[in-house]
Amino acid sequence: MDKKLKYRVFWSWDHSTNWVLNQLGTQNCGVANVYTKRPETFVRDYKRVVDWCHDHGMDAVGIVGLLRDRHGGIDAVRRLCGYANDKGVRIYMIAGLYAYGGIYYEGTSKWCLDNFFKDNPDCIGLDANGKQLWIDRQCPWGFKPDPQGCPSNPKLNQYVLDSLEWVFKEIPELGGIQMESGDNGTCKCPRCQERRAQRDAHEAMSVADMANIYPQAADAVWSQSPDAWVICETYHHFLDKACAFFYDEHPSADLQKLLDMPEKTFFQWKCDVRLDSGQWSEQDKLPPSLAKFRHIMRSHSGTQWWGGRHKLCVDRIRRQCRLSFESGLQGVSIFGEGSSFNANDEFNYLALQYFADSPFASVDNFVNDVMAPRLGGKEYAEMYLNFGRYPDRPEYIPWGVTQIGQLLGKFGLKDYDIIRRWEWLASFLNSFYWEWRSEKEN
């Protein structure tokens, strides 16, 4: 048995991935934003992500919004994928099959799902009141109304399969796809209700809907690119109630469709709630019915979603890796949107690499082996780890920043990168103190 996690993956949105610094139009959050940077910055950003992955044992980069007219469309993606392939890194698209713009996220292409819905409004799902199913995203989480398709509509399903065949034929360099059925709610039309048999009628996301399309979608991908990664997003932890049917002794027709998929299929799970609540232990194992597949556990550590962008999450990532390994998964994923110039992001990324290689290592091992050489020694690395908690304790920040100022004098100007990391941390902490003090004064 492998004593490490084989697959290490970055998850990202195109519009909030910022590895090229000081760019106009930079965004730090969102799920449905326009792309506001210069078109050429898209490839420049992701080349730097690829370089990091190549240098630090990361296998792949997933991108939401990969195909978009605003940053070069197919030509830009082919250039990026070619660069990544030369570096031994896989670029894969993250795409909603029934939502999120489909395969071509934004543009005039016929393979942009939004364009298809304009011409085929009968393919949009229905809510409980029989009205079209839309989610109206509000800033900072997006800007546009987003429709959710009807998974029971044959015309829509054929369009989805055709779009997958098209993209993997058009971009042979593409490394795979993370498929999502869409998490904008579930269609409540009579056909969908009958097909689901009420199993997950109250779930915001339907596992039955996933089973209805994932096997056919995977076959469409592999018909054009047999070595492509196909990652089936579940939106759940495998322990969640919505996934209880994976333990059924007598699989439903929906479940059997998933179980019959090839062994090379990936299933992807998320762990944030269970990490933070402690509702995932080393004794918990993947459902036996899924043992033949490959599995990735993703978290939102240090992001716009959980804990805040650029926050230090070393122990959280350690637990993600340890529990994933103990549960029988083979891979882990975190967001890779922030540049490694941001010292906390750098240490989070290094933590994923370190604990994927050594799932039973401790935080103290990481401090000794990884942080200490980059911060001036173990004593200082332990200080950094402690100061990393201060965004949640702003009253301590002035003392911490004073300590950073004093210890910087010990390094002189000989090791630029050590100084850069400490100065970045001081500036990051000061921003939280400034806001805390300003709110308190007002």
List the model feature ranges, each with a label.
Residues 93, 97-166, 292-299, 303, ...:
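Active-site-adjacent "subsite" loops/lids of carbohydrate-active enzymes
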Residues 1-5, 15, 19, 32, ...:
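Substrate-binding groove of N-acetylhexosamine-processing glycoside hydrolases
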Residues 59-60, 175, 330:
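Short acidic/polar active-site loop segments enriched in Thr and Asp
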Residues 25-27, 73-85, 99-143, 188-198, ...:
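Aromatic- and acidic-residue-enriched segments that line the glycan-binding/catalytic groove
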Residues 1-95, 115-117, 122-129, 158-169, ...:
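Mature N-terminal, pre-catalytic/accessory segment of carbohydrate-active enzymes
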